[in-house]
């Protein structure tokens, strides 16, 4: 099978941002997750090493549910920058996996790690000489800026699965807050296209014009309502 590659900043970014997409792709593509950091600063009161160990296990649990492979780039939460070594590591994974599509976060975001990983993913595709389609997705409701979906995915049939992925990240989900955030976001996007739950995306065309979009493999793809 072809590979879908997800390049993101923190554990839980995939589950919250594209858990529906990942659930729909898992039986059609080999999934490969690349996490730049281990979210070391995501638990106030815990040391970075302790937090990293907790969040790594949670990300491995999510990846197991998706039947995917997981790599970490070894960078530090809240210190992610677009440097040559990180881009080189990411590019090597792109070369090795030869993905049909690379999913990453939208580059305009008030979290510096999100902006950095977006550029790292873009440069990795270029450095690898890959024809992969780059697909941008949104992060949290109060983080991503200037994002208007150009294509939607109806995830109504897998919303429960998405929430299961989100709930793998127990340390980020006190009182089910992260799951409820994901539910609100999917409900809002669903209303925009007339379904129960949806995710929004902005794909860039593959450099090879003959390469079909990954969305062509998904019957749940929807276009914006005029």
Regions found by a protein language model. Name each.
Residues 1-7, 46, 69, 76, ...:
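Metal-dependent de-N-acetylase/amidase catalytic core
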Residues 2-49:
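ATP-dependent adenylation/pyrophosphate-handling site
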Residues 16-17, 54, 85:
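Short, conserved clusters of charged catalytic residues that mark active-site
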Residues 23, 60, 119-122:
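Active-site phosphate/pyrophosphate- and oxyanion-stabilizing loops and adjacent acidic/basic residues
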Residues 27-30, 66-68, 130:
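Short glycine/proline-enriched coil/turn segments at helix->beta-strand junctions
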Residues 36, 63-78:
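A conserved beta-strand->alpha-helix junction
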Residues 41-69:
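Glycine-rich phosphate-binding loop and adjoining beta1-alpha1-beta2 segment
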